């Protein structure tokens, strides 16, 4: 390449068309801190717009990151009025799904009902499917809210996802195309089963409602599929640390994302020591920094057309809005150990 991309997420933060930002990577590399930092910077840079941060990771950490309890409903972040957070609870969502199924069919002996209960309890990736249904719900709400001028309705400019570790995330992102095919087959099946059920005395209003709902879901899924593959609307931020396994996982994930035609052009590398710029570095720090630099050099060569953001290792956990505000600045303005070391050592313990 004739030019080098900025080692920051400034371009992403300023982009005014993005609706969906996914943040993902291997477990334990700082996904929640990174997704929270991106959300905080978006809220700070665009104070007149609303943003939503959703955790789809079953091991929810948003409440810990912001020192504030979040649940399945969007709740405003204290100290940042235009940012809301929510944590999707698969078990609660499963319970809601089964209750909704009860509305369509109250016969406990119906074999179709038994099959549906077995399916929802045993499908691999059901957590991801339920998380995805929450996404569909938000798309529907967005459409309604954009047409509604009342002040109590919130239309989010961008929704940021703090995702589960890589395997779960890739299954989650496969769902739009998988569901699209599955719902298409359901539609074909409903066309054949409908007349048969009527002849057998079944197929009342409840089943008509169910097929109508499937139609609506299919349209929403098709729309999500289009949005997820549009680089103006959706992007994925990879998070890793400068070690072999993390680099390997990141490359695997990027290849998968490209196969889904999803935009990915940013990588955040966390927990860097920058021992060269320390006046009195310990021997262990120097040895580890030497290893980190080796993999950083490989990343720089492998991902020369990506925004490669280098974030420092901190002396304490990043918790609370004020600490996130300080740390998230390095996503916009690259960390300089000679100038910024004082900032990361002065973070307040929460």
Over which residues does each language-model region extend?
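Nucleotide-state-sensitive switch-loop elements of NTP-binding domains
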Residues: 1-21, 26-29, 34-222
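C-terminal lobe/tail of nucleotide-utilizing enzymes
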Residues: 1-14, 225-350
């Amino acid at each position: 390449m004739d030019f080098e991309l900025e080692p920051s997420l400034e371009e992403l933060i300023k982009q005014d068309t993005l609706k969906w930002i996914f943040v993902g990577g291997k477990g334990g590399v700082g996904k929640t801190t990174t997704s929270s930092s991106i959300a905080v910077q978006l809220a700070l840079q665009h104070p007149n717009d609303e943003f939503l941060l959703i955790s789809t990771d079953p091991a929810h950490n948003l409440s810990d990151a912001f020192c504030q309890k979040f649940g399945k409903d969007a709740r405003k972040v204290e100290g940042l009025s235009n940012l809301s957070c929510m944590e999707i609870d698969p078990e609660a969502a499963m319970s809601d799904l089964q209750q909704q199924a009860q509305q369509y069919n109250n016969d406990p002996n119906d074999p179709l009902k038994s099959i549906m209960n077995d399916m929802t309890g045993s499908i691999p990736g059901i957590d991801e499917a339920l998380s995805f249904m929450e996404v569909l719900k938000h798309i529907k709400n967005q459409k309604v809210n954009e047409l509604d001028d009342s002040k109590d309705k919130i239309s989010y400019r961008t929704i940021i996802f703090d995702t589960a570790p890589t395997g779960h995330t890739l299954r989650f992102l496969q769902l739009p195309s998988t569901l699209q095919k599955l719902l298409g087959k359901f539609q074909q099946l409903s066309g054949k089963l409908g007349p048969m059920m009527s002849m057998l005395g079944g197929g009342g209003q409840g089943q008509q409602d169910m097929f109508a709902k499937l139609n609506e879901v299919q349209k929403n899924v098709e729309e999500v599929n289009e949005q997820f593959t549009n680089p103006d609307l959706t992007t994925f931020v990879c998070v890793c640390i400068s070690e072999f396994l993390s680099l390997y996982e990141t490359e695997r994930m990027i290849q998968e994302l490209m196969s889904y035609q999803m935009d990915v052009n940013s990588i955040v590398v966390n927990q860097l020591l920058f021992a060269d710029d320390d006046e009195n570095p310990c021997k262990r720090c120097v040895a580890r920094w030497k290893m980190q630099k080796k993999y950083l050099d490989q990343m720089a060569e492998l991902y020369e057309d990506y925004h490669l953001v280098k974030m420092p290792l901190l002396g304490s956990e990043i918790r609370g809005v004020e600490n996130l505000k300080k740390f998230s600045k390095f996503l916009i303005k690259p960390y300089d150990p000679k100038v910024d070391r004082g900032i990361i050592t002065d973070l307040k313990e929460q």
